[in-house]
Amino acid sequence: MTASLLMLVVLMTSFAADKWITNAQLSLPLLIAAVCATATAAVGIPLLRRLKMGQFIREEGPKTHQSKAGTPTMGGLLVVPVGVVLGSLITRDAVASQQLLSLAVLTLAFMLIGGIDDWSSLTKHTNTGLTARGKLLLQAMATAAFLAIAAWQGWISSSIALPFGLELPLGLMIWPLGLFVVLAESNATNLTDGLDGLASGCGALVFTGLALQLMLRGDNGDPALAGFCMAMAGAWLGFLVHNRNPARAFMGDTGSLAMGAALSGVALLSNSLWPLLVMGGVFVAESLSVIIQVWVFKATKGPDGQGRRVFRMAPLHHHFELGGTDEQSVVPAFWLVTAGLVLLGLVLRP
């Protein structure tokens, strides 16, 4: 699956949804956001280059990535606001507008946290920015504020909707779970952003999948949150024009953290945690590969400080790279898997 084919699939899917799903208006926010994001990135990337926002590549990473050094990062700054602003203007309904505003603030807060992390990395001339603990604390504070507003307004269900009419009642446990979901999803999308076009393509597909299942649930669906999803999908497709191999810019933590926050925020507000888990399976796999790699290495570490490794390198996409599969093959394969998981999530929607 090439980038052009992925874009065509998402576009045609939105047109088909508008035609066949009652109350669906998915293609307009997708198209407007895609065009605007393509333009803002085209204008902004040369500016990032002039400001010397070049990415540093870690030496222990795949050797083929060393040629990417100096590619402008913080590209999320150019497209996330496009998706957020356009997505927030979808509806005139008062309650839906308040939800979209809170979702926009959460997304932009994570973009800011990612931006601080990226900037810290650039000023230190390394591939590491904020400390893991410091970044996690900032993310937790932003998420807690979002959840507090949602709790006050009664926006989040205390049970998780599952397929076949089933529900998993959680009561007050939904709140710590909500915190975990936002932190886990944002860091999972961050880990996925390691190859040209990988996270932006997968993100566009998952946003589209969430929008479709939102419109297929209930009598009239949820056009406000579905429209927000399509605006975000369009923003990432617009960025993909510049981020596909060879990438002219990277989204950085600025974009990847915001992507995960937006996905999880939509899922929490719409009781779509199950669809997000299924459709975002690539994000889950990338994150689990890192957790497994670290845990096994520490558990088997000997006196020499060396331990066993389950994967050649984590996250998972590097495992395939070091196995001899080139980047231009790994990325489309992951897109294809994500597309399959989106279809599965639609079949198994609550």
Swiss-Prot record:
Pathway: Cell wall biogenesis; peptidoglycan biosynthesis
Keyword vocabulary terms for this entry: Cell cycle, Cell division, Cell inner membrane, Cell membrane, Cell shape, Cell wall biogenesis/degradation, Magnesium, Membrane, Metal-binding, Peptidoglycan synthesis, Transferase, Transmembrane, Transmembrane helix
GO molecular function: metal ion binding; phospho-N-acetylmuramoyl-pentapeptide-transferase activity; UDP-N-acetylmuramoyl-L-alanyl-D-glutamyl-meso-2,6-diaminopimelyl-D-alanyl-D-alanine:undecaprenyl-phosphate transferase activity
GO cellular component, one term: plasma membrane
Localization terms from the record: Cell inner membrane
Matches recorded under Pfam families: Glycos_transf_4, MraY_sig1
Reported cofactor(s): Mg(2+)
Transmembrane region(s): 28-48, 70-90, 100-120, 136-156, 164-184, 195-215, 221-241, 249-269, 328-348
Topology term for the membrane: Multi-pass membrane protein
UniProt similarity note: Belongs to the glycosyltransferase 4 family. MraY subfamily.
Protein name: Phospho-N-acetylmuramoyl-pentapeptide-transferase
UniProt source species: Synechococcus sp. (strain CC9605)
